[in-house]
Amino acid sequence: MASFGPAPLFTNHVDLGSILSGKLATEKSPTAVSAYPIATGSSVFGIKYDGGVLLGADTLVSYGKMARYPNVPRLFQVNDTTVITCSGDYADFQHITSLVERMQIEEERTQNEVVMQPRSLHRYLTRYLYNLRSKFDPKWTNIVVAGLQDGEPFLGYISMIGLAFTEDAVTTGLGGAIALPLMRKMLDQNKGKLLTFEEATKIMEESLKLGFALDCVAYPKYQIANINKDGVQMGKPETVSLNWKYVKNFDATL
């Protein structure tokens, strides 16, 4: 039915009041969540040794470049054989850990004595992150999965786009340039054999020291998880005792 009355004076105009009130943006733009990481964690480090795996990460979650939350554990124990950690957006990591918890509860409820293994979790998270990336809705976090698979140490990496691999030494973020060369050099010197627990602990502590010294969003307080045949030993937070002479000679160690 035709409407009667005076025609509007202007037809194709932008209502300034709607722009200022946000009404126009709400009507014409889709609802969106943050597409960039906000509260983030820095590099994490993992290395195999003969009989187990060590994972290390500091306890800081940064808001941009501000050290906002200094006492946040970034090592998550899935069960007695598996631990995961991350660098990147911490909220996305919390979502992933809650997803893993629900999976674990469901498996325990429906299947008797079935324990989630690190390799199967690594494969599941690879497909999960790749699927989200394919939908252009990635999780802004890089995951490291460590544990014991059939009595053998397992260490795997998954990027935010679903790129995955397993290795004897794994780092994320700036740790790939700072500590990974040091780890690989020590593994090469061992001629293909895994390190002892003492050697792995030493290289892990050195990696955390270098991370704190050379990464502007790293933190001196860190935590190390040890996964072996006795289960998961989650270490208490410790503080880096940094010797700047060690950092000065960093290039000579590579």
Spans of model-derived segments:
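Long, low-complexity N-terminal extensions
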Residues: M1-L254
